[in-house]
Amino acid sequence: MGDRRFIDFQFQDLNSSLRPRLGNATANNTCIVDDSFKYNLNGAVYSVVFILGLITNSASLFVFCFRMKMRSETAIFITNLALSDLLFVCTLPFKIFYNFNRHWPFGDTLCKISGTAFLTNIYGSMLFLTCISVDRFLAIVYPFRSRTIRTRRNSAIVCAGVWILVLSGGISASLFSTTNVNNATTTCFEGFSKRVWKTYLSKITIFIEVVGFIIPLILNVSCSSVVLRTLRKPATLSQIGTNKKKVLKMITVHMAVFVVCFVPYNSVLFLYALVRSQAITNCLLERFAKIMYPITLCLATLNCCFDPFIYYFTLESFQKSFYINTHIRMESLFKTETPLTPKPSLPAIQEEVSDQTTNNGGELMLESTF
């Protein structure tokens, strides 16, 4: 009898020592995770993204629309990417207020619009980056055969398809983004019930992950790998000359933005959806998912600040326009009463910026694409 009591005591002691390691679980198997740090983190990151993203993407759109006039196929993709970033940035003041005050006073409609803008930007950015990567692949690997495919009309059609796809997914997910009132505090885009996750959101998440992340990731990696392999060929090197370094920089920046901003978020989102729908009931994994989700979410929103680097390294005419406009602004700040040198007229500047190359092989692979 004494041995039995000793064994029961040892078993209870072992069970109590293991319980904290499995997470703070209560008697009804619910896992308690404190993720309240996300509000201050999101508010701070959103504030930075709003300031930098608004300035850089507004300036970029001005250059694309009024200086370059979207004369190349790649410029059309990049213009739509900048537009996606700018639309999302314009909704950030509402999110900043919400995260710092932990209260959403703007109503259910703005909550849905804010959620749609976020999803549209994240997955629209990945798809537009994929379009740029595929366009670069066609221009370098098949410079002559791709002439009939790489047209401004086809680029516009592809962009329209991307917008329809991401808006459909964003609106579908945001239909469940209703505001919830708890203790006189209104929340937005959080607090979904387990039933909603199991019935709807888990399926929507899987669809968005496959179409908006896995397929673009495969295409980006594949196209970039083939382009890098093609650049090693002597025939390609003789065509593009010293611009090989520019192409390498462009691919590096492109893949860096994709990997840093989107891979962590989408990887954690998949785990987060499994946890919230209770497909996985391990408390340790649930804690990991709920802690890492807001962190990777902030990384994903930083793409609005990093995308202008892609604009700069992808379009040589964008670099020219950026340099010319910066030079003019600096001259206007420090100009004297009697100008020492005549300034170029605006038509001349526009002509210089929007100059397009001819259709020979080397120029086709560079200026019209990058």
UniProtKB/Swiss-Prot annotation:
<feature type="transmembrane region" description="Helical; Name=7">
    <location>
        <begin position="295"/>
        <end position="315"/>
    </location>
</feature>
<comment type="similarity">
    <text>Belongs to the G-protein coupled receptor 1 family.</text>
</comment>
<feature type="transmembrane region" description="Helical; Name=4">
    <location>
        <begin position="156"/>
        <end position="176"/>
    </location>
</feature>
<keyword id="KW-0807">Transducer</keyword>
<keyword id="KW-0446">Lipid-binding</keyword>
<dbReference type="GO" id="GO:0035727">
    <property type="term" value="F:lysophosphatidic acid binding"/>
</dbReference>
<keyword id="KW-1015">Disulfide bond</keyword>
<feature type="transmembrane region" description="Helical; Name=5">
    <location>
        <begin position="204"/>
        <end position="224"/>
    </location>
</feature>
<feature type="topological domain" description="Cytoplasmic">
    <location>
        <begin position="134"/>
        <end position="155"/>
    </location>
</feature>
<feature type="topological domain" description="Extracellular">
    <location>
        <begin position="95"/>
        <end position="112"/>
    </location>
</feature>
<feature type="topological domain" description="Cytoplasmic">
    <location>
        <begin position="316"/>
        <end position="370"/>
    </location>
</feature>
<keyword id="KW-0297">G-protein coupled receptor</keyword>
<keyword id="KW-1133">Transmembrane helix</keyword>
<dbReference type="GO" id="GO:0016604">
    <property type="term" value="C:nuclear body"/>
</dbReference>
<dbReference type="Pfam" id="PF00001">
    <property type="entry name" value="7tm_1"/>
</dbReference>
<feature type="transmembrane region" description="Helical; Name=3">
    <location>
        <begin position="113"/>
        <end position="133"/>
    </location>
</feature>
<feature type="disulfide bond">
    <location>
        <begin position="111"/>
        <end position="188"/>
    </location>
</feature>
<feature type="topological domain" description="Extracellular">
    <location>
        <begin position="177"/>
        <end position="203"/>
    </location>
</feature>
<keyword id="KW-0812">Transmembrane</keyword>
<dbReference type="InterPro" id="IPR017452">
    <property type="entry name" value="GPCR_Rhodpsn_7TM"/>
</dbReference>
<feature type="topological domain" description="Cytoplasmic">
    <location>
        <begin position="65"/>
        <end position="73"/>
    </location>
</feature>
<comment type="function">
    <text>Receptor for lysophosphatidic acid (LPA), a mediator of diverse cellular activities. Transduces a signal by increasing the intracellular calcium ions and by stimulating adenylyl cyclase activity. The rank order of potency for agonists of this receptor is 1-oleoyl- &gt; 1-stearoyl- &gt; 1-palmitoyl- &gt; 1-myristoyl- &gt; 1-alkyl- &gt; 1-alkenyl-LPA.</text>
</comment>
<feature type="topological domain" description="Extracellular">
    <location>
        <begin position="1"/>
        <end position="43"/>
    </location>
</feature>
<feature type="transmembrane region" description="Helical; Name=2">
    <location>
        <begin position="74"/>
        <end position="94"/>
    </location>
</feature>
<feature type="glycosylation site" description="N-linked (GlcNAc...) asparagine">
    <location>
        <position position="24"/>
    </location>
</feature>
<feature type="glycosylation site" description="N-linked (GlcNAc...) asparagine">
    <location>
        <position position="183"/>
    </location>
</feature>
<dbReference type="GO" id="GO:0005886">
    <property type="term" value="C:plasma membrane"/>
</dbReference>
<feature type="transmembrane region" description="Helical; Name=6">
    <location>
        <begin position="255"/>
        <end position="275"/>
    </location>
</feature>
<feature type="topological domain" description="Cytoplasmic">
    <location>
        <begin position="225"/>
        <end position="254"/>
    </location>
</feature>
<feature type="glycosylation site" description="N-linked (GlcNAc...) asparagine">
    <location>
        <position position="15"/>
    </location>
</feature>
<keyword id="KW-0472">Membrane</keyword>
<feature type="topological domain" description="Extracellular">
    <location>
        <begin position="276"/>
        <end position="294"/>
    </location>
</feature>
<dbReference type="InterPro" id="IPR000276">
    <property type="entry name" value="GPCR_Rhodpsn"/>
</dbReference>
<keyword id="KW-0325">Glycoprotein</keyword>
<keyword id="KW-1003">Cell membrane</keyword>
<feature type="glycosylation site" description="N-linked (GlcNAc...) asparagine">
    <location>
        <position position="28"/>
    </location>
</feature>
<keyword id="KW-0675">Receptor</keyword>
<dbReference type="GO" id="GO:0070915">
    <property type="term" value="F:lysophosphatidic acid receptor activity"/>
</dbReference>
<feature type="transmembrane region" description="Helical; Name=1">
    <location>
        <begin position="44"/>
        <end position="64"/>
    </location>
</feature>
<protein>
    <recommendedName>
        <fullName>Lysophosphatidic acid receptor 4</fullName>
    </recommendedName>
</protein>
